């Protein structure tokens, strides 16, 4: 069964999975006494999107996918380390409470200097990870994953929430 993703509520419900929405929460900022610090900001640049899926056929999105891979841009104090902790869902929720299983592997997370998707360094998004902010106080974080629709997956749009907690380390 071919299933197509729905882009807007006005379109006919013929889709299965649209996207996992990247939401940001729990930002903490460490500051040295007596020093002015740039505030820590996180911008969700691109949501992790699975698009059209076939029932019973897994679909992986690479973290390096410049269209469908998730991207967050972090700004803060110059040349410091930040602790990144993702809260990843086991599934997305769709029509009438239907769920669509997700999985995230050991190389589905990546980081690089800002906006340099091609020079990412992989990390396991299931585990806390330390990444450096560059001399300008910036880093980009990327996320891929796998949607695992069942053979009898209910058609419709599915969404989920991914939370990234960022802490500036002393």
Residue ranges and their predicted role:
Residues 3-21:
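Bacterial N-terminal signal peptides that target proteins for export
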Residues 101, 106-107, 122-124, 159-160:
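Structured interface patches
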Residues 108-129:
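Mid-chain, well-packed structural core segment of small domains
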Residues 30-31, 123:
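Hydrophobic membrane-targeting signal helices
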Residues 34-99, 128-170:
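N-terminal small/polar-rich segments of proteins
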Residues 19-30:
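Bacterial N-terminal signal peptides
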């Amino acid at each position: 069964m071919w299933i197509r993703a729905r882009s807007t509520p006005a379109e006919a419900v013929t889709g299965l999975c649209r996207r996992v929405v990247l939401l940001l929460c729990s930002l903490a900022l460490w500051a040295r006494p007596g020093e002015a610090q740039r505030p820590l900001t996180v911008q969700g640049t691109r949501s992790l999107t699975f698009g059209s899926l076939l029932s019973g056929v897994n679909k992986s999105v690479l973290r390096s996918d410049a269209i469908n891979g998730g991207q967050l841009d972090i700004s803060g104090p110059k040349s410091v380390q930040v602790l990144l902790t993702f809260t990843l869902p086991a599934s997305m929720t769709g029509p009438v409470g239907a769920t669509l299983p997700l999985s995230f592997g050991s190389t589905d997370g990546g980081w690089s200097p800002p906006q340099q998707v091609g020079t990412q360094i992989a990390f396991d998004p299931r585990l806390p990870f330390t990444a450096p902010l560059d001399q300008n106080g910036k880093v980009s974080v990327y996320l891929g994953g796998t949607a695992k629709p069942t053979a009898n997956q209910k058609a419709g749009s599915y969404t989920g929430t991914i939370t990234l907690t960022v802490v500036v380390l002393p």
